[in-house]
Swiss-Prot record:
GO terms for biological process: iron-sulfur cluster assembly. This is LYR motif-containing protein 4. Required for nuclear and mitochondrial iron-sulfur protein biosynthesis. Keywords: Mitochondrion, Nucleus. It holds the Pfam family Complex1_LYR. The lineage of its organism: Eukaryota, Metazoa, Chordata, Craniata, Vertebrata. It comes from Xenopus laevis (African clawed frog).
Amino acid sequence: MSASSRSQVLSLYKIMLRESQRFSSYNYRTYAIRRIRDAFREKKNVDDFLEIETLLHRAKENLNVIQRQVTIGQMYATHKLVIESAEHR
């Protein structure tokens, strides 16, 4: 993987994790973070440039989905779960 591809992938990974932290729902937040980490780990050894480009494109689409869902979740917020209240102590 070239240096520019590597920096693009790492940047996108960090942005996706940061955006996932914005989910108001504990379950959505933990699921999204776990899926992002697992997906990036699974594909970390890909060397084919075209496949990397395809994966980057798919990840950018998923980032858009995450951002949209975070916005929708904030519009229709629900009560916090008991486990979320304990996290802030």
